[in-house]
Amino acid sequence: MKSFADKSMPTILMSAILILAMAFLFGCSEDDVTEPAVPDDTTDDTDFEATDWTTETHSKDADPNFDEVFEDHTVKRIDFVITAERWQTMLDDMTELYGEFGTGGGQPSSFDEDPVFVPAEVFYDGIEWYRVGLRFKGNSSLVSTWQRGILKLSFKLDFDEFEDTYPQIENQRFYGFKKLSLKNNFDDQSMLREKVAGDVFRDSGLAGSHTAFYTLYVDHGEGPVYFGVYTMVEEVDDTVLETQFDDDDGNLYKPDGVGASLVEGTFTEGVFVKKSNEDDSDWSDILDLFDALHDDTRTTDAASWRTSLDAVFDTEVFLEYLAVNTVIQNWDTYGLMTHNYYLYNDPDTGKLTWINWDNNEALQEGKQGGSLALDFADLDSGQWPLIEYLYADEVYRARYDAFLAEVIDGPFDTGTIQATYAAYESLIEPYATSEIAGHTFLNGSGDFQMAISELNQHASERASAVDSYLD
């Protein structure tokens, strides 16, 4: 196979050159109206042959290859090649959504609209993937990065997003994966949090995304530019359900908004966004959770309340998640924020199951008042009933306490996790400390070493905190 630098895309390049030449020759007057660019309006790149296509690398018929895509002990390189016009479309769309690049400003009132997808070529290990759907991703982290003038933005990839336009890529996959997230390690100068936290959840036996380190290079018209160290994250609505549940046909929700707190009376369909079975207008499983959680038997007949709640919600999974999350700490999760989790109605059990998401803020005390205490003494009363009610129940609290001990003696054992930090520090340091200005959250290489030191200190402090709590 040729490397991506050796491969040619004559149609794309010739079209781009022709467009630039015409713009230079004819210019435009102040009276000209510039219409928003739309992908594919001016670039005719539909006539191509997918010469690198193989069943193993590109076909839907291949099983997801986790060993290839999510290898733990290496840093892999991935390249995006985007025409200058389409790159500008992405930037213009961001400006329309969030204001001028690098000019600061506050957070928008909502994140109702995702950034625009454009077709791009993806290169990995000398192989090309064709007309891959590519867009920026994220909410507050995306806006903050953009407003700070940093182009190290997170990306979402959908390998057959544009199959209707390009029939050659029908059901295109990346080693069995349709969708992937490439996260920018926002505000994480260690660049380890997303991966390590995700691994702790999975090593605890909870369903969750595989992760891996990648370096990203983007060529948007002037050659490859190093965008830095990223974390590749498996998508829940793609292969997590397919490979970690026996039946992946249930309802998957990604709650975001006031109702995601599960406070009584706050349910709205718009908050519980469906990521599967979207055409089925049925939220009865979510309503059953609200009803069971807030049933009057909670204060009059605790055993009956637990039985009803356990029938519709996997409390065992949630309590284990809660223990892991509270030990490792993450302020950007349920209990402080109304997002960053999925609910899956597992057909095998008939219960809604909690799945964690988004761990770049984990493994630290955190912002906005910090993470929750192990005994939830700082939990806002009445605002987070799933934690408040379960922790107040002696049976559920005993399970939570048992899970705390398992986490701190297992996946988050101080010696184990510090050895992990040391191994990953050696692995990614050359790539992290060579990030370039405008594409990094580091102010200098010393920031990386300091961040690793803080992670090690945090691990020791959490062990002491759990020991004190359990005593």
Regions found by a protein language model. Give the residues of each.
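Bacterial N-terminal signal peptides that target proteins for export
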Residues: K2-A16
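Bacterial N-terminal signal peptides
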Residues: M14-F24
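Bacterial Sec-dependent N-terminal signal peptides
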Residues: A23-D61
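Hydrophobic alpha-helical membrane-insertion signals
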Residues: D52-S140
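Middle-to-C-terminal accessory/interaction subdomains
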Residues: E56-H58, D67-V69, H73-R77, R86-M90, ...
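Short, solvent-exposed loop/turn elements at domain surfaces
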Residues: R86-D93, Y130-V132, S141-S144, T165-Q168, ...
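Conserved oxyanion/phosphate-binding beta-strand-loop segments in alpha/beta enzyme cores
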Residues: V118-F186
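Internal "kinase-insert"/substrate-recognition segments embedded within catalytic cores
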Residues: K152-T165, R173-N185, M191, S204-S209, ...
